[in-house]
Amino acid sequence: MSEAEQVVFVDEHGNPTGEVGPKLASHTAATKLHLGFSCYILRRSDNKLLVTERALSKKVWPGVWTNSVCGHPAPGEKVADAIRRRAAYELGLAQLDDIQCVLPTYRYTTPPYHGIIENEFCPVYVAYASDEPRPNPEEVEAYKWLPWSAYADMLRAEPDNMSYWAKDQYPLLRLCEPFVALMD
């Protein structure tokens, strides 16, 4: 987590309040609600989901498996642009297509992890990639492409090895018609 990065504080409906704060200082017990995003990247050729293992050096949730990419839009940055920026930085994916918001009002707060707490208004997106990832080792330990059913099995079989938000989003995505339609 970089202290130089800024997060955008939002109200209960996800509207920016006009305030921003340093990313690291904005993930404590006094964390204000701020804007994030979560993205599930599907491989265009076979519709498999890109699942990533967070780098062991990460301050938050190191070594756990999660969805494809997450992050925070910078002040004034469109979420789709932030998704592309983080996918390029974390995964080496220069091109993402058809970015769609499937859970526009998703919000979560994590239990403390070494003093760090997530309190995010975090819309969930789906995007498509045609290229193979080239992960940044500072961000991603490993990755794999899985059918949605195998991802569901992984969440059930290894819940302690999965990110908090991945486990929290799964039941919502299963009931989300736009997402389910993409998985067919």
Language model features: what each stretch is:
Residues G63, P75, Y106-D184:
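Nudix hydrolase/Nudix homology domain
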Residues K23-G36, S45-R85, Y89:
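Conserved Nudix-box catalytic region and its N-terminal flanking loop in Nudix hydrolases
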Residues G14, E90-A94, T110-H114:
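Short helix-to-loop capping/linker segments positioned immediately adjacent to catalytic or ligand/cofactor-binding
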Residues S2-S38, L42-D46:
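Acidic, metal-coordinating catalytic segment for phosphate/diphosphate chemistry
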Residues L56-K58, T105-Y108:
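Short, catalytically relevant binding-site loops at active-site mouths
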Residues A94-P104:
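A short coil-to-beta-strand element that immediately follows conserved catalytic motifs
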Residues F37-C39, S68-V69, C101, P123-A127:
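A structural signal for short, well-ordered beta-strand segments
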